[in-house]
Amino acid sequence: MNRTVRVLLLITVAGLLPRTIASSSEERKSDWASLEYLLGDWVGEGGGQPGQGAGEFSFHPGLQNRILVRKSYAAYPPTKDHPAYRHDDLTVVYKESDSASPRAIYFDNEGHVINYSITIFPDQKTIEFVSEVLRSSPRYRLTYVKTGGDTLTLRFEIAPPGKPDSFSTYIEAKAKRK
């Protein structure tokens, strides 16, 4: 191949490459459109069985938009029944294929590892993370409800082993975007 043809081929390929990369990036960005309102940094407060607490969480894309990473902490002041403590967790939201529904895996400082399926309700305001049914383990449900442009509520519920649909509220909170 002569040098002129190689240069023209290189220019053609180089000209197409940015469009291909941009197109691929836009496709990946649209993969998370249904979860987009969760993206960003949030501050919240609420309470439940562990007591009244306050904390922060964030959802940010990772691995070139292939996953969403949620980092969270909640701080609880001391009470007459227990000392002050802090709960930290990390969740990775992913899709096993481009057409699959999102799933998540959760880890926390207490040693929990929870696999969730994620349902986005038709109203596009409610997102529900529900754990697998495991015979001898509790089942968990975490629900986010968009209440405004920069506000949401969340509810974390637990169902006892053997009663996978008998959820009771463990924590309820309100959050606002930072």
Give each language-model segment a name:
Residues 8-18:
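Bacterial N-terminal signal peptides
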